[in-house]
Amino acid sequence: MRKRDRIFIAPLLAVSLLFAAAPTALAAESGEQFVFDKADLLTTEEEDELNDMANNLAENFNMNFVILTTDDAEGKEEEVYADDFYMDNGFYDDGKDGGAIYIIDMDNRRVQVETAGDMKVRYITDDRVDGIIDAGYEDVKDGAYAAAFEAMLNATVDYIEDGVVDGKYTYNEDIGEYDYYDTGK
């Protein structure tokens, strides 16, 4: 190939690479990334659909809805791995009112939901966590991981819409008082 041909082809190749990357950049700008499929359990389409769902929920409730799969929990239990992931990736202190991380851990063979902020303090009790996991459990057993995450997200929304559990409170250590949430029930 002559030098003149290489000079013409190099800029053309650079421009074509820019256009090839444009859809990816546009997709990333359309919302936050909430789906992290490290175990490769989801198709690209399933990841996109779940990410859209999580972004809609994040916008509606001002909370994070993080979906995580892993096949290497780095020697940690699923709860610790999920909590570390949530914190290390900036979800804990991003200005939202809390959130949840849903993990399918193929290393420990476990499904877990961990919550933070208002999601934990106000809406999602231990019993409700069990209900959320139960909502997706059969789908996980069947290998229908996207359906499992969707069911768990929907169960979470149902609990948020049900409101605060009657009798739920927090303790303010600074003033030594309990704050009981008015459920209106």
Give the role of each language-model region.
Residues 10-20:
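Bacterial N-terminal signal peptides
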Residues 1-12:
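Bacterial N-terminal signal peptides that target proteins for export
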Residues 22-24:
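Transmembrane signal-anchor/signal-peptide helices with a preference for the extracytoplasmic
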Residues 2, 26-184:
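Folded, non-transmembrane soluble domains that reside on the lumenal/extracytoplasmic side of membranes
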